[in-house]
Amino acid sequence: HIAGTLLREGIIPDAIIITDPQPHMYQQVKGLDTKKIPLILLSTASSSVLDYYEGPVYIAYQNGYRKAEEIAEKIGAKAFETGGSVTTTALDIALQFKAEKVIFVGVDLAYTGGNSHAEGVGRRITDTGSLRKVISCSGEEIYTSKNLDIYRKWIERRIANLTGTVIYNTGNGARIAGAPCRRWDEFLGE
């Protein structure tokens, strides 16, 4: 859904990454003009996407899944750490391909403004009983879930001793150690 949101706003992503094995994932790209946008499809992601994707497709093989590791080794491909989410997978891909700069936009890893996802995509979070609090980029306490906090900590471990790549965290989501908080509009025009 986020790919469609970006394209409707005139923002052309460098790539679209799909990691989810659910059969309905084709809905993420159905009807979108993707002819010039590469798709990175995790080897265990839903192949239904391929019926609707018009651009170039690259398969990403993941570490920790024996079949994927074997195929990657057999064909001489890289294998990537997935960390459990599309964001963590995308980060590892960017880092393994030596990205100089990674800018997290929309990677809140918390329920910023009480919402589960970007405006118009997710749902309102009203029950905070099972949630935990973390510090946001603006210095305030915000709620997050156990899973989102695991992803945040995974990212922090992955970038802890990183050299050659600068990671920026935009928005008012959870603060990520090692990723300075910046306003996303500071990067417009780059």
Question: PLM features: residue spans?
Answer:
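Metal-ion/cofactor- or nucleotide/acyl-coenzyme-handling active-site neighborhoods
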Residues: 2-190
